[in-house]
Amino acid sequence: MESLPKTLSTLARLRERDITLTFATGRHALEMQHILGALSLDAYLITGNGTRVHSLEGELLHRDDLPADVAELVLYQQWDTRASMHIFNDDGWFTGKEIPALLQAFVYSGFRYQIIDVKKMPLGSVTKICFCGDHDDLTRLQIQLYEALGERAHLCFSATDCLEVLPVGCNKGAALTVLTQHLGLSLRDCMAFGDAMNDREMLGSVGSGFIMGNAMPQLRAELPHLPVIGHCRNQAVSHYLTHWLDYPHLPYSPE
């Protein structure tokens, strides 16, 4: 977390300019609210890849759940896959067995799954279902899911090793549209950064969209007209925003 002070300083400069901050993520609202509180950050939240939108005060502005019949089919069907299944609702993250390796991405927040019998999961409040595993295996699973669900759900890769089943029409871009309407803003006024296919709609709809250097090749192929900045490990977003604040009229180089 050595880069955290620099990133927080950049975000503080944006707030001083009265620029509205929004974190759009596949992560759970409970985790993100904890992180924002720990860092004393004021920002809107788009979580669960668009399934929830929260205000600065934590008020729920928008929600989108999987239809109960879709959740039931995904949970009860025997899929030909080695991937692990993960279910999300407002109470947290649930899965059927311990997978300690998955918790490495949540070391900072301490957010973790709860072990349950997935077939006893309440079906009426599921926000999304994720499958985590090998990309080739998930690609085959995507075909199975599409054949079973058709147009009743939105499937997307939020990472090469994570395939998500989301409500129809649910994505970060759609959620950002809801938020901008709530704030009386235009998508043309927005700047966004992303690296995976769950960022596609958002990056394609805002006035200034930027693809990370570590992005999935599929995202670059879908949005070839968008500029590519540096790698996330080099704090490329903070680097770009600092340049934008200091030299708004000069061309940017990630070097």
Swiss-Prot record:
Single GO MF descriptor: phosphatase activity
The cross-references to CDD domains, in alphabetical order and at most eight, read: HAD_Pase
Indicate which residues the UniProt annotation says bind Mg(2+).
195
Instruction: Give its E.C. classification number.
Output: 3.6.1.-
* Key words, A-Z: Hydrolase, Magnesium, Metal-binding
Q: Please verify whether the record's keywords include Glycoprotein.
A: no
Domain of life from the UniProt record? Bacteria
Cofactor(s) recorded in Swiss-Prot or TrEMBL: Mg(2+)
According to its UniProt entry, what is the function of this protein?
Catalyzes the hydrolysis of 4-amino-2-methyl-5-hydroxymethylpyrimidine pyrophosphate (HMP-PP) to 4-amino-2-methyl-5-hydroxymethylpyrimidine phosphate (HMP-P).
- What family is this? Belongs to the HAD-like hydrolase superfamily. Cof family.
Q: What is this protein called?
A: HMP-PP phosphatase
